């Protein structure tokens, strides 16, 4: 079956639609449910967590939600400029899988009595620009950005799992499934030919990540 060729206007509208769905609460629906995400009968609900723990977990999930917003933007930006069709399709498929993470984080934030970060539009725009630029430089570098981004996300998730109370089974199940998926995305991008990024680029990405985590935990 021949793939339908989209006009530049169609592509622009599709990107705009994705941005609106990513940034508008309640518009992203998960296709999957993370394993063991439903609390056990004796597991504490969000409202029964001590207030300091609830605030901390809420801040962590806000960070993770913004991270998924950035992932959506990064993949969409790369897909918009990737030269090889199979690379573009891989970016779009990864973005669809990340939509589950976005929905899970948003739902958990609501359960904890919070709202997503107000800085999401800013980080979406920045990440889209990074993704589009990476795609223009070349597909190997674009895949390298994916690998490095996912590896950094995995480190964040491991840190958050260490901080989330053992009794908060729902949050932990979400983070565990996200970690599994992100590792898969990193390996897939590397195996597809992702280049190792220069040390200055990796350090710059780490610095940007630190700015994101510091601000979105609070705002």
Swiss-Prot record:
Top-level lineage group: Bacteria
* Alphabetical list of PANTHER family matching this protein: 5-DEMETHOXYUBIQUINONE HYDROXYLASE, MITOCHONDRIAL (PTHR11237:SF4), COENZYME Q10 BIOSYNTHESIS PROTEIN 7 (PTHR11237)
Q: What residues does Fe cation 2 bind to? A: 98, 150, 182, 185
Q: Briefly, what is this protein's role? A: Catalyzes the hydroxylation of 2-nonaprenyl-3-methyl-6-methoxy-1,4-benzoquinol during ubiquinone biosynthesis.
Name the cofactor(s). Fe cation
Offer a single GO CC term for the protein: plasma membrane
Per the entry, the cofactor note is:
Binds 2 iron ions per subunit.
Residue ranges with Low complexity bias: 35-46
Q: Spell out the InterPro entries in the cross-references.
A: COQ7_proteobact, Ferritin-like, Ferritin-like_SF, Ubq_synth_Coq7
Alphabetically ordered keywords of this record: Cell membrane, Iron, Membrane, Metal-binding, Monooxygenase, Oxidoreductase, Ubiquinone biosynthesis
Q: How does it sit in the membrane?
A: Peripheral membrane protein
Pathway it works in: Cofactor biosynthesis; ubiquinone biosynthesis
Q: What is its EC number?
A: 1.14.99.60
One GO term (biological process): ubiquinone biosynthetic process
Enzyme type, top EC level: oxidoreductase
Q: Where is this region: Disordered?
A: 21-51
Record protein name field: 3-demethoxyubiquinol 3-hydroxylase
Q: Which reaction does it catalyse?
A: a 5-methoxy-2-methyl-3-(all-trans-polyprenyl)benzene-1,4-diol + AH2 + O2 = a 3-demethylubiquinol + A + H2O
Pfam families found in the cross-reference section: COQ7 (PF03232)
What protein family does this chain belong to?
Answer: Belongs to the COQ7 family.
User: What organism does the UniProt record list as the source?
Assistant: Alcanivorax borkumensis (strain ATCC 700651 / DSM 11573 / NCIMB 13689 / SK2)
- Gene Ontology terms, MF aspect: 3-demethoxyubiquinol 3-hydroxylase activity; metal ion binding
Q: Where in the cell is it found?
A: Cell membrane
Q: Where does Fe cation 1 bind?
A: 68, 98, 101, 182
Q: Which Gene3D superfamilies match?
A: 1.20.1260.10
């Amino acid at each position: 079956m021949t793939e339908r060729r989209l006009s530049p206007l169609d592509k622009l509208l599709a990107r705009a639609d994705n941005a609106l769905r990513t940034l508008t609460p309640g518009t992203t629906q998960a296709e999957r449910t993370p394993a063991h995400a439903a609390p056990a009968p004796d597991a504490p609900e969000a409202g029964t967590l001590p207030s300091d723990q609830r605030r901390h977990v809420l801040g962590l999930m806000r960070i993770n939600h913004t991270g998924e917003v950035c992932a959506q933007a990064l993949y969409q930006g790369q897909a918009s400029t990737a030269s090889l069709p199979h690379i573009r399709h891989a970016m779009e498929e990864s973005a669809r899988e990340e939509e589950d993470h976005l929905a899970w984080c948003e739902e958990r934030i609501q359960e904890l009595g919070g709202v997503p970060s107000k800085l999401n539009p800013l980080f979406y725009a920045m990440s889209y620009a990074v993704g589009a630029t990476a795609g223009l430089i070349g597909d190997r570098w674009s895949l390298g950005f994916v690998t490095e981004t996912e590896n950094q996300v995995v480190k964040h998730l491991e840190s958050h799992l260490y901080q989330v109370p053992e009794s908060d089974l729902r949050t932990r199940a979400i983070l565990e499934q996200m970690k599994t998926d992100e590792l898969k995305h990193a390996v897939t991008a590397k195996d597809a030919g992702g280049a190792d990024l220069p040390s200055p680029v990796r350090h710059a990405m780490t610095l940007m990540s630190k700015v994101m985590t510091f601000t979105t935990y609070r705002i």
